[in-house]
C-alpha cells in the first residue's frame, strides 16, 4: 500500500516522455532509484512516490484522485477530457504548467499520391486514429462528416492495409509517415508535456511540497532557456550592449584592473545568443565574450 501522506506522481513508464520526465525530476534534486521493471519507485530524499504507468492511464489517475500529480502529454490529456465529457462526466484537474519537452503535433496524413485540397476534401472518408475525439472536434468544426477507424497502434499502416483513406496520428519528424508512403497534410493539434494536479484540497504538507517542486521546475526550465554571459565592454556603449542581451535583471558591472574605459559585464540572458548577436556585440567594442550554460537558477 502507498503511504497517502507522501506526494504521488504518475509518469510514463516507457516512451517518448519517460526519459525527459525522469531527467526533470533528477535536475530538481529528487533522488529516485528507477528499476526498469519496477512500477512504483520511492524518492530517497523527499516524501515522494513515483507511479510508472501507461501514458493514457495518467489523466484518469489524476482526475480520479488516485495520484496527486501527473506528467503527461497535452494530446493524451485532452483526448481523455473529451472522452469523459462525451460520457457525461465532469472531469476536474488543475494544469500547473506546460513543460519544455515532449513537443509533437497531431496531424492528418494521406498517401503521397493522393490529392488534398483542404479538410473538406475528407468528406465521408474513413480515417484511422488513436485520438477519435480530438479528430471529431476538429472535423466537426470544419463541417466534415467522416468515419472513424479506431486503432491503438501502428496507425500509419491503415491506408496500405485498406482500412482507411487517411490517418490522424502524432508526428515528430515525419520520418515514420514517409517510410509508410504517407505525407502530412494538416496539423490539427499541437502538444507538449504538462504537469497536472488532482482536484480538491491538499493537506498543507503536500501543498507545501508541491510549491517547492514547482519552484524547482521553474528554475530548471529557466536555466535551460537562459545563458550566463560574461564580456568586457566599453563604458560608453553599455546601454547599446544591454539592448542586445535581454536579461532577467540588470547586469553586474565590475571594474577592470588598469583599464578605466572598459568594465566587465556579467548577466543572465533569457534568449538564445546567436552568432549574429555576438558579431554585433563585437562591433560595439565588446571583447572576451563568454557564453555559458546554467545548471540551476532561482529568482
Curated annotation (Swiss-Prot):
Compartment list: Cytoplasm
Keyword Cytoplasm: yes
The protein's name: ATP phosphoribosyltransferase
Organism: Edwardsiella ictaluri (strain 93-146)
Assembly: Equilibrium between an active dimeric form, an inactive hexameric form and higher aggregates. Interconversion between the various forms is largely reversible and is influenced by the natural substrates and inhibitors of the enzyme.
Chief location category: cytoplasm
Regulation: Feedback inhibited by histidine.
Pathway terms, separated by semicolons: Amino-acid biosynthesis; L-histidine biosynthesis; L-histidine from 5-phospho-alpha-D-ribose 1-diphosphate: step 1/9
GO molecular function: ATP binding; ATP phosphoribosyltransferase activity; magnesium ion binding
NCBIfam families: hisG (TIGR00070), HisG_C-term (TIGR03455)
Similarity comment: Belongs to the ATP phosphoribosyltransferase family. Long subfamily.
Catalytic activity: 1-(5-phospho-beta-D-ribosyl)-ATP + diphosphate = 5-phospho-alpha-D-ribose 1-diphosphate + ATP
Function (record text): Catalyzes the condensation of ATP and 5-phosphoribose 1-diphosphate to form N'-(5'-phosphoribosyl)-ATP (PR-ATP). Has a crucial role in the pathway because the rate of histidine biosynthesis seems to be controlled primarily by regulation of HisG enzymatic activity.
EC number(s) reported in the record: 2.4.2.17
Entry GO terms, CC: cytoplasm
Cofactors required: Mg(2+)
Keyword annotations: Amino-acid biosynthesis, ATP-binding, Cytoplasm, Glycosyltransferase, Histidine biosynthesis, Magnesium, Metal-binding, Nucleotide-binding, Transferase
Top-level taxon: Bacteria
GO biological process, one term: L-histidine biosynthetic process
Cited Gene3D superfamilies: 3.30.70.120, Periplasmic binding protein-like II
Gene: hisG
